[in-house]
Amino acid sequence: LHTAYRRQRQMCIRDSYGAGGSGVRVMTSSSSPGVALKQEGITYCAGAEVPCVVLNIMRGGPGLGTLQPSQSDYYMSTKGGGNGDYRTPVFAPASVQEAVDMIIEAFDVADQYRTPVMVVADGMIGQMMEPVDFEKERKQRNLPAKDWASCGHQNKRKPNVINSLYLQSEELEKHNIKLEKKYKEIEENEVQYEMYKTEDADLVFVAY
């Protein structure tokens, strides 16, 4: 485990791009304005299919806002806050234990689909303390090998080049169709919810 602190939020997401592109598991975190500054880097990661985890401990806004808890970054997280029609899987923990569980799973989802994954908590969860279980049984995924990673080819294969630049419109269209298929697959396979006292309900409202 290696931890790095950068003076600028933009540097953090660019470090994540480089680390994720080399096949390393990487996470960057900040609160709402800091994550807003990372959006350019997140869309680069989405376009280049670089897996990483982005943790947002949400606080009130807009602007500098407040340090108090908030859930106001929903659209920025779920609809893609940077340029282009990209999407990211989003986990939204409701407790400290769920934050631990979902961050662990977020790394697996990022690797399985080669995508940045958002974890959105709020300032209340960010400041809470409770006993957590790191050893609980978790969903086991058959993760693909990272043969796409740019980690040094040692003259044994063609170098892997990872970027999000497609100068020919046909190439970009083909790439975006591929991404949209991936987002549809994530939508179909990765939805999570918890039912509570809904057995006899005629109508259920779902909100965040």
Describe the role of every protein-language-model region.
Residues A19-L37, P51-N56, A92, V204-A207:
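A short, small-residue-rich loop immediately preceding and capping a beta-strand
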Residues P69-D122:
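Conserved thiamine diphosphate
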Residues Q10, S30-A36, I42-Y44, N56-G63, ...:
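Acidic, glycine-rich active-site loops and adjacent beta-strand->loop/helix elements
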Residues R114-M195:
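Conformationally flexible catalytic loops at phosphate/diphosphate-handling active centers
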Residues D15-G18, K38-I42, G63-S70, D101-I104, ...:
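Short acidic, glycine/serine/threonine-rich loops at helix termini
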Residues L1-I13:
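Single conserved hydrophobic/aromatic residue that forms the stacking wall/gate
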Residues R6-R7, E49-G61, R141-W148:
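A glycine-rich helix N-cap at a beta->alpha junction
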Residues G63, L67-S70, N83-D85, K181-Y208:
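Thiamine diphosphate
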